UniProtKB/Swiss-Prot annotation:
PROSITE patterns hit by this protein: PCI
Basic and acidic residues compositional bias, start-end: 1-16, 501-525
Name of this protein: 26S proteasome non-ATPase regulatory subunit 3
Lineage, uppermost ranks: Eukaryota, Metazoa, Chordata, Craniata, Vertebrata
Similarity section: Belongs to the proteasome subunit S3 family.
Function per UniProt: Component of the 26S proteasome, a multiprotein complex involved in the ATP-dependent degradation of ubiquitinated proteins. This complex plays a key role in the maintenance of protein homeostasis by removing misfolded or damaged proteins, which could impair cellular functions, and by removing proteins whose functions are no longer required. Therefore, the proteasome participates in numerous cellular processes, including cell cycle progression, apoptosis, or DNA damage repair.
Pfam families for this protein: PCI, Rpn3_C
InterPro entries from the UniProt entry: 26S_Psome_reg_C, CSN3, PCI_dom, TPR-like_helical_dom_sf, WH_DNA-bd_sf
Domain PCI as annotated: residue spans: 286-465
A GO cellular-component term linked to this record: ficolin-1-rich granule lumen
Length: 534
């Protein structure tokens, strides 16, 4: 009993709080206080989220303003390059400014163009008043940059025609990118009137770009036939002035114009009556070779068409212009099939071409196996795509090639086969059709066989050793010609320093400056104008 009493007292002592205010855990807060704290936290989180959103918007706006400032400075630098080209009569500085045009055009907006037009057109109020209504006036704030590229005496001097054309071209490109084609047409028409009255060699390169975008505007408006006479007039002027860049651009625009309306005869006459300038850049050469390849393919000159399109791929930029290379490959595959050759499987596996060339891969399989049913199936499935690519007319011609391939496969498989079985395998209407097709294949040299008209069968002849014919010689000749063409084109594309560089008439400082400029120019030319393809 004593032990039980002492145990109860010890338990009671443990339950009592320690005397003297010792450490003790505080009781948990009541539930309503917890709920109120959560609501306060939620309210505070909402206000924090709004503040974060405002901060992010302000940061994005600040970043955009910085990008606009950089774009304005780039435009200012390009204008300096144009002025330097005019004063020093060096067209390479114009090329340097135009080479950055695709990069600059992607960063254009109303704020940049409004500031540029107001900043540069200080003396020419007529052009400024004409361009500003097409642009939205930005809301000026304290953070906005005061863009004043022309101050003092320069503000009162008129702009150079090259600079004025370049700035107006930027507005045209922005309107095009914004899909405001009607407004772009008005600005471009005004720009063409100004360029047509000028006769300055430094303006030729800028004018060539203006011609290109002028035709693009009319193409988007589906009015290419309206601009054709203007392009012809400018081509005559460019030819008389020996403007190589203008000639190349205008010739390509006219060929594109004719091919858009399927005027192949007029396009062929233009090619035969004109000479494409050798000094044109690689991109214009690539376009010209592609257009001539299309003309040759329609006119049944398949060997010449394959040669020109192969050269077009060689002239095209290596890492960009994917759309252009896809278009050329589509036409080249069809032309090779029409020549009786099977394209290399490797080109169908390239990542940039694999998806777009899938219908042509199925078409190639049908032609290779001589399967007429599969050929008709591919034609029904992808007919609209072939029409959009402009290859449908040529693909229709492939039906005879499919039949020829089927006849050749049958001839290799059977030493003797009836005409009725051939008609059944090729899905022809009657044995008479099979007889006609086999006779034509024998005449064209597709197969070595004879037809027994009385008994209605085809007797294949023994295979001739191909090495006893001229086939190997022709194949080697084709390969050697290809290598020689590459060598000749590489030599023509090389750039040699002028003889004046051999004269030791410059100081060491001038030599260093010149070498630095040459190094920069070489780096820019190495890019080969990759961004010029739209």
């Amino acid at each position: 009993m004593k032990q039980e009493g002492s145990a109860r007292r010890r338990g009671a002592d443990k339950a009592k709080p320690p005397p003297g205010g010792g450490e003790q855990e505080p009781p948990p807060p009541p539930a309503p206080q917890d709920v109120e704290m959560k609501e306060e936290a939620a309210t505070g989180g909402g206000s924090t989220g709004e503040a974060d959103g405002k901060t992010a918007a302000a940061a994005a706006e600040h970043s955009q303003r910085e990008l606009d400032t950089v774009t304005l400075e780039d435009i200012k630098e390009h204008v300096k390059q144009l002025e330097k080209a005019v004063s020093g009569k060096e067209p390479r500085f114009v090329l340097r400014a135009l080479r950055m045009l695709p990069s600059t055009s992607r960063r254009l907006n109303h704020y940049v163009l409004y500031k540029a037009v107001q900043g540069f057109f200080t003396s020419n109020n007529a052009t400024r008043d004409f361009l500003l209504p097409f642009l939205e006036e930005p809301m000026d704030t304290e953070a906005d940059l005061q863009f004043r590229p022309r101050t003092g005496k320069a503000a009162s001097t008129p702009l150079l025609p090259e600079v004025e054309a370049y700035l107006q071209l930027l507005v045209v490109i922005f309107m095009m990118n914004s899909k405001r084609y009607k407004e772009a047409q008005k600005i471009s028409d005004d720009l063409m009137q100004k360029i047509s009255t000028q006769n300055r060699r430094a303006l030729d390169l800028v004018a060539a770009k203006c011609y290109y975008y002028h035709a693009r505007v009319y193409e988007f408006l589906d009015k290419l036939d309206v601009v054709r006479s203007f392009l012809h007039a400018r081509l005559r002027t460019a030819t008389l002035r020996h403007d190589a860049d203008g000639q190349a651009t205008l010739l390509n625009l006219l060929l594109r114009n004719y091919l858009h309306y399927s005027l192949y005869d007029q396009a062929e006459k233009l090619v035969s009556k004109s000479v494409f300038p050798e000094q044109a850049n690689n991109n214009e050469w690539a376009r010209y070779l592609y257009y001539t390849g299309r003309i040759k393919a329609i006119q049944l000159e398949y060997s010449e068409a394959r040669r020109t399109m192969t050269n077009a791929l060689r002239k095209a930029p290596q890492h960009t212009a994917v759309g252009f290379k896809q278009t050329v490959h589509k036409l080249l595959i069809v032309v090779e099939l029409l020549l009786g050759e099977i394209p290399d499987r490797l080109q169908f596996r390239q990542p940039s071409l694999k998806r777009s060339l899938m219908p042509y891969f199925l078409l190639t399989q049908a032609v290779r196996t001589g399967n007429l049913a599969k050929f008709n199936q591919v034609l029904d499935q992808f007919g609209e795509k072939f029409q959009a690519d402009g290859t449908y007319t040529l693909i229709i011609r492939l039906r005879h090639n499919v039949i020829k391939t089927g006849v050749r496969m049958i001839s290799l498989s059977y030493s003797r086969i009836s005409l009725a079985d051939i008609a059944q395998k090729l899905q022809l209407d009657s044995p008479e059709d099979a007889e006609f097709i086999v006779a034509k294949a024998i005449r064209d040299g597709v197969i070595e066989a004879s037809i027994n008209h009385e008994k209605g069968y085809v007797q294949s002849k023994e295979m001739i050793d191909i090495y006893s014919t001229r086939e190997p010689q022709l194949a080697f000749h084709q390969r050697i010609s290809f290598c020689l063409d590459i060598h000749n084109m590489s030599v023509k594309a090389m750039r040699f320093p002028p003889k004046s560089y051999n004269k030791d008439l410059e100081s060491a400082e001038e030599r260093r400056e010149r070498e630095q400029q040459d190094l920069e120019f070489a780096k820019e030319m190495a890019e080969d104008d990759d961004d010029s393809f739209p």
